[in-house]
Regions:
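Local sequence-structure signature of Cys/Sec-based thiol-disulfide redox active-site neighborhoods
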Residues: 1-26
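Compositionally biased, disordered extreme N-termini, encompassing classical targeting presequences
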Residues: 1-2, 29, 82-83
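Short beta->alpha junction loops/turns
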Residues: 10, 38, 63-64
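Non-catalytic interaction surface on structured domains
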Residues: 18-21, 28-31, 59, 71
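Thiol-based oxidoreductase modules, predominantly thioredoxin-like and allied folds used
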Residues: 30-42
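Short amphipathic alpha-helix with an adjacent loop that forms part of the alpha/beta core around
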Residues: 44-48
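Structural micro-motif
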Residues: 49-58
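Non-catalytic, surface beta->alpha helical segment in thiol-disulfide oxidoreductase systems
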Residues: 59-83
Length: 83
């Protein structure tokens, strides 16, 4: 399972989302990839998805949420994405 979190430097919501997703991903012994929208990989992804806001989470390349999820919501998204 590939989990990516699009963030922006200095974004307080992104820091909060990162904490939530780090916890949820660690429980699954998976890895979280952070993509800053100011870097080429992050820019390319935001353009491809036509995103105007961060944080945003992708699981296996599919946009699953924008904004800050609760830990319970993050766990649920991970459970739904298992396959």
């Amino acid at each position: 399972m590939k989990i990516e979190l699009l963030i922006a430097e200095g974004c307080p919501f992104c820091r909060e989302a990162e904490q939530v997703w780090r916890t949820a991903v660690a429980e699954r012994q998976a890895e979280l990839r952070l993509l800053d929208v100011s870097h080429p990989d992050g820019q390319a992804l935001t353009q491809r998805l036509t995103l105007n806001t961060v944080p945003a989470v992708l699981i296996d390349g599919i946009l699953k949420g924008v904004g800050v999820q609760t830990l319970a919501d993050a766990r649920q998204l991970l459970n739904q994405s298992r396959g």
